[in-house]
From Swiss-Prot:
Origin species: Blochmanniella pennsylvanica (strain BPEN)
Entries under PANTHER family matching the protein: 50S RIBOSOMAL PROTEIN L4 (PTHR10746), LARGE RIBOSOMAL SUBUNIT PROTEIN UL4M (PTHR10746:SF6)
Function noted in UniProt: One of the primary rRNA binding proteins, this protein initially binds near the 5'-end of the 23S rRNA. It is important during the early stages of 50S assembly. It makes multiple contacts with different domains of the 23S rRNA in the assembled 50S subunit and ribosome.
Keywords: Ribonucleoprotein, Ribosomal protein, RNA-binding, rRNA-binding
Record-given protein name: Large ribosomal subunit protein uL4
rRNA-binding in keyword set: yes
Region (Disordered): 47-83
A Pfam family annotated for this UniProt entry: Ribosomal_L4
Gene that produces this protein: rplD
A molecular function GO annotation: structural constituent of ribosome
Family named by the database record: Belongs to the universal ribosomal protein uL4 family.
Length: 210
C-alpha cells in the first residue's frame, strides 16, 4: 500500500504530496482488539514497581502490654496499642513488595503494534513526514509546522534520532512527545490522537515488526 508523505519544511497541500510504499503486513492488518487488550494489560502490569510496603500489627514498634484492664473502666476493651483500629497501629492485611511481571511473547507484542498502526492508518491518524526537523528550538515554530499537518493537539513523533531543536521545542507542550523509532510501544500509540513518523525510519520500523 502507499501513504502520502508530508513535507515538514513547507506548507504543502495533501493533494500535491508524494506517495511512499509501505508494507501491507505492517500497515494493513485486521484490527485485533482482544490481542491489543492483552498486550497493553501486560505492558502496564510490567511497568508496576511493586515496592509498596506496610507494617502489620506484629511489625509496628510499641509495647505489647494491655493498655488498661478488661473491665471496670467504662472504656471500650483494648488489648494492644498496635491494634489496626488505633492511631499509629498496624495495617490490616498489610501490603508487601510483590513482583507483578507477566510474560508475553514477541509475536503477540509485534502483532499488537501492527494492528494499532493499521488502525491509525485506517482512521487517517498516522502520517509520514519528510524533513522532520526545525532550525531553531522554538515552540511556536514547531506548533506552526504541526498545524500544517494536523489540527489535533495530541501528537506522537517518531524520528531517526532525537533532534535537539525538536526535543527542546516540544518539551514544554502538553501531549506532544518526540521519540526514536526504537522506542515504539502499544500504550503510547493509543494514548496520542495522531502519530507522525519520519519517512527515513519507516523501513526500520517495518524491520522491527516483521
Amino acid at each position: 500500500m502507499e501513504l502520502e508523505v508530508r513535507d515538514f519544511t513547507t506548507e504543502i497541500n495533501i493533494l500535491d504530496s508524494e506517495k511512499f510504499s509501505v508494507s501491507d503486513e505492517i500497515f494493513k492488518c485486521p484490527f485485533n482488539q482482544a490481542l491489543i487488550h492483552q498486550v497493553i494489560s501486560t505492558y502496564l502490569t510490567n511497568s508496576r514497581q511493586g515496592t509498596r510496603s506496610q507494617k502489620s500489627r506484629s511489625e509496628v514498634s510499641g509495647s505489647n502490654k494491655k493498655p488498661w484492664r478488661q473491665k471496670g473502666t467504662g472504656r471500650a476493651r483494648s488489648g494492644s496499642v498496635k491494634s489496626p483500629i488505633w492511631r499509629s497501629g498496624g495495617v490490616t492485611f498489610a501490603a508487601k513488595p510483590k513482583l507483578y511481571a507477566q510474560k508475553i511473547n514477541k509475536k503477540m507484542y509485534r502483532g499488537a503494534i501492527r494492528s494499532i498502526l493499521s488502525k491509525l492508518v485506517c482512521d487517517n491518524r498516522l502520517f509520514l513526514v519528510r524533513n522532520l526537523f526545525i532550525k531553531e528550538p522554538k515552540t511556536k515554530l514547531l506548533l506552526e509546522k504541526l498545524r500544517t499537518i494536523t489540527s489535533k493537539k495530541s501528537i506522537l513523533i517518531f524520528t531517526d534520532f532525537l533532534d535537539k531543536n525538536l526535543l527542546l521545542a516540544s518539551r514544554n507542550v502538553h501531549k506532544i512527545e518526540v521519540r526514536t523509532a526504537t522506542h515504539i510501544d502499544p500504550v503510547s500509540l493509543i494514548n496520542f490522537n495522531v502519530t507522525l513518523i519520519a519517512d527515513n525510519v519507516i523501513k526500520k520500523i517495518e524491520k522491527q515488526l516483521v
